[in-house]
Amino acid sequence: MNIERADFVDRVKIFVKAGDGGNGCVSFRREKYVPKGGPDGGDGGDGGFVFLRANPSVSTLIEFVNKRKFVAENGKHGMGKKMKGRNGKDLFIDVPVGTVVKDAVTGEIIADLNEPGKIVCVARGGKGGRGNAHFATSTKQAPLIAERGEKGESRWLELELKILADVGLVGYPNVGKSSLISRISNARPKIANYPFTTLIPNLGVVKYDDFSFVVADIPGLIEGASEGVGLGNVFLRHVERCYLIAHVIDVSGYEREDPVRDYFVIREEMKKYSPFLLEKPEIVVANKIDLIGKEELEKILKRLRDATDREVIPVSAVTGEGIDLLVSKLASIVREMKVEKPERKEERFVKPSPVWRRLPEKFHLEVVKEDEGYWVVEGENLRVWIERFDLNQRDARLMLLQVLEKNGLNNKLKEAGVKEGDVVRIGDFEFEYRE
């Protein structure tokens, strides 16, 4: 799979907003011969959820460069005859397989969409409000009250793509990684005799007998990459998922003088990015052996084996010498590690419940003086009531004031110094204080 530089994006931020719940309805049954039909206001529909879904046909995050805001549909309002409003449509956003989803504010990892079809809910829709049919009692048979729908969740997300490959080719620029991947796989990357020809990771599928595996050509690293020198080390995130690292070294002596030093410089840059990378299985691929004499090659190979304590496989990506042995070794290691990996049990996706906060019955009230003769009643739990009900509805005001009085509202007003005739505001509702 080859991706053009302009189309390769592996980290973006997006904003997601779930749908709000629809409002409940205030309605009364009106039919011939039914003079006292009673309340029949229906409930509002639930707001749509926002999901991210791993889609194998999507290869980069380029689609999110120009569109960063995603909003699900709101639930419809309830209607008379106890008709519930329609639920808002859920919004599914397709991302590449291998996308890590983080909360952009806290940095918390929400999900790793590392398998095709895997789904995660990133914003829950709000539950629809209840219609007045729910508020009828033996003493209140015609309630003029209904609930507003809950607000849907919203958040900023950071999406980070980590390419899924079995083998990662790492090394200095121009050591022949692109030539190597084109020799062993179906990948056809740009190849040229200058550093940083590869600007994005290239993927290739390698077939060996009845087994196939994926190799990633990671853009070249140089000393100081962790400080941003060259292309930096940001592409190393794509090695994190690999089973095996194939460290490509130029042993020709034409462009790189000391293969052993090169090996440890790259290892140090990998360590600075993530010490975890050094724990991965690794083989050393000594490339460009066609450009060096046999006697000199043997000396270099011995130095590499002694210094690295790794298996060193000499190859020439140009002539093909040693390629069969390399592919056989890569396939053997990857096959063995895939067998050792515990089988993942298929997870059944269960849609979570919509946002719904219980109406609190206890309040920590605070009376704040905003101006001479003008006061505001505040409180964390009070916010839920204010958002849930339309206080322009008389019955909603009465119900809230009754609950507040049980929590000592009158005493709080007196303690704050509220005088008769002063204006008190609760949410959008204002009233004149009377003792």
Swiss-Prot record:
InterPro entries per record: G_OBG (IPR031167), GTP-bd (IPR006073), GTP-bd_Obg/CgtA (IPR014100), GTP-bd_prot_GTP1/OBG_C_sf (IPR036346), GTP1-OBG_CS (IPR006074), GTP1_OBG_dom (IPR006169), GTP1_OBG_dom_sf (IPR036726), OBG_GTPase (IPR045086)
Domain Obg: 6-164
Ranges for domain OCT: 357-435
CC cofactor: Mg(2+)
CDD domains documented for this protein: Obg
Binding site for Mg(2+): S178, T198
EC number: 3.6.5.-
Class of enzymatic activity (EC top level): hydrolase
Keywords: Cytoplasm, GTP-binding, Hydrolase, Magnesium, Metal-binding, Nucleotide-binding
SUPFAM superfamilies: Obg GTP-binding protein C-terminal domain, Obg GTP-binding protein N-terminal domain, P-loop containing nucleoside triphosphate hydrolases
UniProt-annotated binding residues for GTP: 171-178, 196-200, 217-220, 287-290, 316-318
A single GO BP: ribosome biogenesis
Principal subcellular localization: cytoplasm
A single cellular component GO annotation: cytoplasm
Localization, UniProt: Cytoplasm
Alphabetized GO MF terms: GTP binding; GTPase activity; magnesium ion binding
Pfam families (UniProt xref): DUF1967 (PF09269), GTP1_OBG (PF01018), MMR_HSR1 (PF01926)
All residue ranges annotated as the OBG-type G domain in the record: 165-335
Subunit description: Monomer.
Function: An essential GTPase which binds GTP, GDP and possibly (p)ppGpp with moderate affinity, with high nucleotide exchange rates and a fairly low GTP hydrolysis rate. Plays a role in control of the cell cycle, stress response, ribosome biogenesis and in those bacteria that undergo differentiation, in morphogenesis control.
PANTHER family registered for this protein in UniProt: DEVELOPMENTALLY REGULATED GTP-BINDING PROTEIN-RELATED, MITOCHONDRIAL RIBOSOME-ASSOCIATED GTPASE 2
Similarity section: Belongs to the TRAFAC class OBG-HflX-like GTPase superfamily. OBG GTPase family.
Descriptive protein name: GTPase Obg
Species of the source: Thermotoga petrophila (strain ATCC BAA-488 / DSM 13995 / JCM 10881 / RKU-1)
